[in-house]
Amino acid sequence: MNLVSLKDIVFGYSHTPVLDKVSLDIESGEFVGITGPNGASKSTLIKVMLGMLKPWEGTVTISKRNTEGKRLTIGYVPQQISSFNAGFPSTVLELVQSGRYTKGKWFKRLNEEDHLEVEKALKMVEMWDLRHRKIGDLSGGQKQKICIARMLASNPDLLMLDEPTTAVDYDSRKGFYEFMHHLVKNHNRTVVMVTHEQNEVQQFLDKVIRLERGEKGGWKCLTWNSCDELF
């Protein structure tokens, strides 16, 4: 079952195309890595998939339902973590708890399941012991971790991650890859992740999408269904 399909996508800035006839399919239950050199428009590709950027040409299709027939939910962690506004949420715990709020139910009363999911997400990124710390007192790497935790707490079917581990240490990155692999293989999640840590993550990936320069100057997609084919 295809969750995401791109067909002949062309997109650019001003009058310069950066994605040139990009086509790809992402199936349910895959751990997909998007790679390529710096400036290869990997972040742009993710934003086109999410509908944050409208392509000049081509079509983007995202399934409205998961494999169980329920409404598909999507989690997104951007490359650049925006600065958090003062006020609510003011602590690590409050921010991650907000991942459990559904649309139209901000400040809902959290139940036992909600609290367990929040605790599990914070422990996964090794931030449980800092749950009462003010967000303004966190380092860049810690802010990146709690953004990941907030997404995990929402239990999305499709996880879209734009270099989510750039500011964290090697052991934390490895643990994160292992957990993503666990979600894919044991909980029927689908993960799409932009990464530069190819050597670290390759053993966990089901598919690799690499952006390479096309003849007209834009970036094209090459897809490998086995990491061994690329690496």
Curated annotation (Swiss-Prot):
UniProt keyword annotation of Magnesium present: no
Cellular compartments per GO CC: ATP-binding cassette (ABC) transporter complex
Gene3D superfamilies, alphabetized: P-loop containing nucleotide triphosphate hydrolases (3.40.50.300)
E.C. number: 7.2.2.20
Oligomer status and interactors: The complex is composed of two ATP-binding proteins (ZnuC), two transmembrane proteins (ZnuB) and a solute-binding protein (ZnuA).
Topology in membrane: Peripheral membrane protein
Class of this enzyme: translocase
Catalytic reaction list: Zn(2+)(out) + ATP(in) + H2O(in) = Zn(2+)(in) + ADP(in) + phosphate(in) + H(+)(in)
Family (UniProt): Belongs to the ABC transporter superfamily.
Organism: Bacillus subtilis (strain 168)
CDD domains: ABC_Metallic_Cations
Domain ABC transporter residues, every copy: 4-230
Superkingdom assignment: Bacteria
Keyword set, alphabetical order: ATP-binding, Cell membrane, Ion transport, Membrane, Nucleotide-binding, Translocase, Transport, Zinc, Zinc transport
Upper classification of the organism: Bacteria, Bacillati, Bacillota, Bacilli, Bacillales
Protein name in UniProt: High-affinity zinc uptake system ATP-binding protein ZnuC
Disruption of the gene: reported phenotype: Disruption results in low transformability.
Chief location of this protein within or outside the cell: membrane
